[in-house]
């Protein structure tokens, strides 16, 4: 099958973005990237849904390309609106949206603004450190993540990302200590176990360490056990790179095993559902026309798909409950309008009089509950 490619030039606030979506060799995957000033600033690769023929793949790519173009414009439009009344939390959430989409420089600026408004904002400090790591500034990343670690309660993910920054800096001793600390807090942290195993292989690549055969075997076995435990905790770990890494490890090809283990998981995996929830909440606050029924239905659909894959997250179920309540608000309003139309036609229609009054009471109750929930959800 010949490659399918869609390409668009998009101008936003004086910036000229090139968006390209294309199928990859083999016909099972596709990728898209966003380019600015000759530099790729965002790039992702995904699988096609099963069962698509050539025409289906083309239509799927075309629809996705159009949707990404709209999303790109809406993200930057929302970002501009936030500047009008910025708060630490809204800047952090906007930064997470940028970070999840690969706009690292824009994310960094948002996290810096959040910390400027609140110097002890833990989440902004953590995400700032992660962003610096993704930008390749490892020394600054380590400093920022250590600062986040010292700000408040111990979180496993802070130690994990700090461990990654040390690992990419070749400071294996510090990396191992961070991964062990993350696992002490959360023993089921699959990615931390995988990186701990990777660090064990890293020791085998160091020159001049004088490791004997017994120590080499011990480190290789520890790497294998940590990797297998990670795969048992999160089946997504057991991908092609994982299988290659294990094979290389068995055949004592440690350099190839090390690189393959690094490739098993991305340097940064957004927290499940955050981008979807944050975008919806920020649009509630800053959108020009607020939230309409179509956007709410799309939000419900996206969240439901995430929950289907990750049913164990209580906060996502809560957000979906809020979304259904917002959707219910549109239905109640529509009911009220229809009762009022009935009364315009026949002001003495008793059923419409009673039902209109009851629905008006329900509408006020729904509005009151939504006001409390949305303020709480957006500001915390």
List where the protein language model places each region.
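Alpha-helical segment of the N-proximal tetratricopeptide repeat
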Residues: 80-123, 127-137, 274-305, 309
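Helix-start (N-cap) detector for alpha-helical repeat units in TPR-like alpha-solenoids
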Residues: 88, 122-123, 156-157, 190-191, ...
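Canonical tetratricopeptide repeat
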Residues: 93, 127, 161, 195, ...
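Position-specific recognition of the canonical hydrophobic site in helix A of tetratricopeptide repeat
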Residues: 99, 133, 160, 167, ...
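Conserved structural position within tetratricopeptide repeats
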Residues: 113-116, 146-150, 180-184, 228-232, ...
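Short coil turns that delineate tetratricopeptide repeat
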Residues: 119, 153, 187, 232-236, ...
């Amino acid at each position: 099958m010949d490659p399918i490619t869609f390409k668009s030039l998009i101008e936003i606030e004086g910036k000229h973005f090139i968006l390209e979506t294309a199928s990859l060799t083999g016909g099972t995957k596709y990728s898209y990237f966003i380019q600015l000033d000759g530099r790729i600033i965002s790039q992702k690769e995904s699988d096609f849904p099963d069962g698509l023929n050539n025409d289906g793949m083309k239509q799927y790519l075309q629809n996705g390309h159009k949707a990404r173009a709209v999303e790109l414009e809406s993200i930057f439009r929302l970002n501009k609106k936030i500047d009008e009344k910025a708060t630490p939390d809204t800047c952090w959430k906007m930064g997470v949206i940028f970070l999840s989409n690969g706009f690292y420089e824009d994310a960094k600026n948002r996290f810096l603004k959040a910390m400027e408004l609140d110097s002890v904002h833990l989440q902004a400090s953590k995400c700032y450190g992660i962003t610096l790591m993704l930008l390749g500034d490892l020394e600054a990343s380590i400093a920022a993540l250590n600062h986040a670690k010292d700000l408040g309660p111990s979180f496993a993910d802070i130690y994990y990302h700090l461990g990654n920054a040390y690992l990419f800096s070749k400071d294996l001793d510090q990396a191992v200590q961070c991964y062990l600390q993350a696992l002490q807090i959360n023993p089921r942290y699959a990615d931390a176990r995988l990186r701990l195993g990777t660090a064990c292989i890293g020791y085998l690549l160091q020159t001049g360490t004088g490791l004997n055969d017994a120590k080499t075997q011990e480190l290789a076995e520890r790497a294998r056990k940590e990797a297998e435990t990670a795969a048992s905790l999160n089946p997504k770990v057991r991908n092609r790179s994982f299988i290659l890494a294990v094979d290389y490890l068995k055949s004592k090809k440690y350099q190839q095993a090390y690189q393959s283990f690094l490739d098993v998981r991305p340097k940064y995996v957004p927290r499940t559902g955050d981008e979807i929830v944050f975008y919806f909440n920020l649009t509630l606050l800053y959108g020009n026309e607020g939230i309409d029924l179509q956007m709410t239905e799309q939000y419900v659909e996206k969240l439901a798909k995430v929950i289907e894959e990750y049913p164990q997250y209580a906060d996502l179920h809560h957000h979906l409950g809020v979304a259904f309540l917002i959707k219910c608000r549109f239905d109640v309003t529509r009911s009220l309008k229809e009762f009022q139309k009935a009364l315009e036609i026949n002001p003495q229609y008793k059923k419409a009089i009673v039902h209109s009054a009851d629905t008006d009471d329900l509408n006020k109750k729904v509005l009151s509950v939504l006001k409390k929930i949305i303020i709480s959800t957006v500001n915390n």
